Swiss-Prot record:
This is NADH-quinone oxidoreductase subunit D. GO terms for cellular component: plasma membrane. It catalyses: a quinone + NADH + 5 H(+)(in) = a quinol + NAD(+) + 4 H(+)(out). NDH-1 is composed of 14 different subunits. Subunits NuoB, C, D, E, F, and G constitute the peripheral sector of the complex.
Length: 404
């Protein structure tokens, strides 16, 4: 291993062939959508070699996970893929609940699934909208961003925050859904359906967009698997793998939805897969929203779920539980577990090793962006510099998740 310093690049590329240039795409550049750096050697407009540099937003989350309690680490998950934070929250909480063998009420699972799919739609809107902007098609983005804002308003009313939601808890939710939740979710889905089709016509059927994306940045199924691809980027390469279908969690085995599959793993096919996934997410939400069961929004778990404040102030038993959870944390039984969920970008996995204390002994996060970014040099090598922007955008690399 070596550190990719300025001296490293100076030594490696000090004898460039005549006519070749070394350019930096990032770390501060609109096309990178985050603090990412790519050192690119070009011959005219053609990319000869590329090298990716990571770590600009590294915040030691895995090490923090060994110091924080299981509840405290939840705030770190908000700051991974900050475009669809509830999916990160749910992935972490499911891993902890699995280790504790906690069964949550169906109401909790329904709400978690609805929020997950709304977050997936938000993430795909960002990815597709910004891809259009990167290729010069600004107007198409506006058709979906209005509906993304409507989803944000639901999440803000439900959680109190737009980005750092921290909504899940071990054994349940932070609070119950508000009275108009089901109605507003159905209105959002109703508005999204025609908007998605309009956006599809404006962007994915546009001749210029097709010319800039078809066959660009492609990857074979074999190479995608070798690099560790998952999610929409893996399915765009023709691999039928979705954690929700192949290793179901929550109630995904009880709902009906299709898994879209691409062919050549190009920018176009990654876009087509994400477009269809938005339709399928709406389909999942509509199956759930009318059937949210009544009942509690958390399990009867006094040693792990904080009691209501009014009970803490008026009941000695609740006061003791509150004190124990805050001061001593939640004790997870000794053991190790890996929990994978299908986040918007792919398989988000949390590997936890517990020694029975209030903090994990070891935490590892399998973040999908990390694997995509490793492939970037191979995907753009031999292509045009302008096409590298589209390739990066279609991979949907989020710096907060990449560096973790």
């Amino acid at each position: 291993m070596y550190e990719k310093t300025a001296e490293h690049f100076e030594q490696k590329y000090k004898n460039l062939p005549e006519g070749h240039l070394l350019v930096n795409l990032g770390p501060s550049h609109p096309a990178t959508h985050g603090i990412l750096q790519n050192v690119i050697q070009i011959d005219g407009e053609r990319i000869v070699e590329a090298e990716s540099v990571i770590g600009y937003v590294h915040r030691c989350f895995e090490k923090l996970g060994e110091r924080y309690t299981y509840n405290q680490f939840l705030v770190c998950t908000d700051r991974m893929n900050y475009v669809s934070t509830p999916l990160n929250n749910i992935g972490w909480i499911l891993a902890v609940e699995k280790m504790m063998q906690v069964e949550v009420p169906d109401r909790v699972t329904y709400v978690r699934m609805i929020i997950s799919e709304l977050s997936r739609i938000m993430d795909h809107i960002i990815c597709l909208g910004i891809l259009g902007v990167d290729l010069g098609a600004f107007s198409g983005m506006l058709h979906l961003f209005h509906h993304r804002e409507n989803i944000y308003q639901i999440i803000e009313k439900l959680t109190g925050a737009r980005l750092t939601t921290t909504f899940c808890r071990i054994g349940g939710l932070e609070r119950d859904i508000y009275p108009e939740f089901e109605k507003e979710v159905k209105l959002v889905c109703k508005g999204l359906k025609p908007a998605i089709e309009e956006f599809n016509s404006l962007l994915l059927k546009n001749k210029i967009f097709l010319g800039r994306t078809e066959g660009i940045g492609g990857i074979s199924a074999e190479n995608a698997i070798a690099y560790g691809f998952s999610g929409p980027n893996l399915r765009a390469a023709g691999v039928d793998w979705d954690v929700r279908k192949d290793k179901p969690y929550m109630l995904y085995d009880k709902v009906d939805f299709d898994v879209p599959i691409g062919e050549d793993g190009s920018v176009l096919h990654r876009s087509l897969v994400r477009m269809e996934e938005m339709r399928q997410s709406i389909r999942i939400i509509e199956q759930l929203v009318d059937g949210i069961p009544s009942g509690a929004w958390h399990a009867d778990l006094p040693h792990a779920y904080l009691p209501e404040k009014n009970k803490v102030y008026n009941n000695m038993e609740e006061l003791i539980y509150h004190f124990k959870i805050i001061m001593h944390g939640v004790k997870v039984p000794p053991g190790e577990h890996y929990m994978a969920t299908e986040a918007a970008n792919g398989e988000l996995g949390f590997y936890i090793v517990s020694e029975g204390e209030k903090s994990p002994w070891r935490v590892h996060v399998r973040r999908p962006c990390f694997w995509y970014y490793q492939s970037f040099a191979e995907l753009v090598r031999g292509g045009l510099l302008a096409d590298s922007v589209a390739t990066m955008s279609s991979l949907n690399v989020i710096a907060g998740e990449l560096d973790c």
